[in-house]
């Protein structure tokens, strides 16, 4: 009788285990795994503030996480060439022969580059492309130069030397900035745009008037921190860095003759006039006469491998970045929501992954 009770007890335990297993198997599958997937990325510092702002929301929605180490667009392109990370960002297209055949471009992040300055004036400065080009090319060296004064009537401009700060690393932000200078003021910025400021500089940085006055720093955080600690300085970077560094931001004259602030609406208006190619590249139209276009709007391209082992998670991340709730998660950062033909292109590119 004792053996029979033990046998019955064992059978009951077995039945309980089988029932529990069946109930677990019958549950509908979830889009989230217990641990999720941790994606890794690097590259453009332009992308960092948006990615930071969207990280928690993406995790809550997908169960996945990501880490992004920045390093600059050049570092992102190099990492992509070596097959490092799940995604890498570059603010200019990766057209070099080193790009792997399975890597595609997804222009997923849009925002303005701000021309930022540390100057003791109360009114926001207004600057045209030709004036900005003259400042960064070293032909305008004083804040009260007639070119600046003519655009800022009523502003008490000091007779101080302008200290120019540029990106010393390979930078897509620099590439876009110098493309803008060459595109809108080619007589002054005579060289084509370049990701390397030194090689794209239309003159010599070692002349007596430029040496020590035009200096470099690495990364967006580096140039804005240096500018923030240097009175009478000027630099260029993503808008999100201006406030932290205590910098003012100029309104820039567009091709229609209007001075436009670097905001999301102005960026969207400018990007809407760009030519979008099937390979994911944008060609900006600096001559667009859209009234509120901000002519220093740019995109950052996600460089992704279509054969990624984490294809599903990667697609979900890029889709989340393009969702309006991501660029508007912190409106003060100035990122623009991608819409229209560019959004359609992005969705097509994302569909190629996996």
Residues covered by each model-derived region:
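Short, Lys/Arg-rich N-terminal segment immediately upstream of the first membrane anchor
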Residues: 1-4
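Flexible loop/hinge segments at secondary-structure junctions
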Residues: 7-17, 21-354
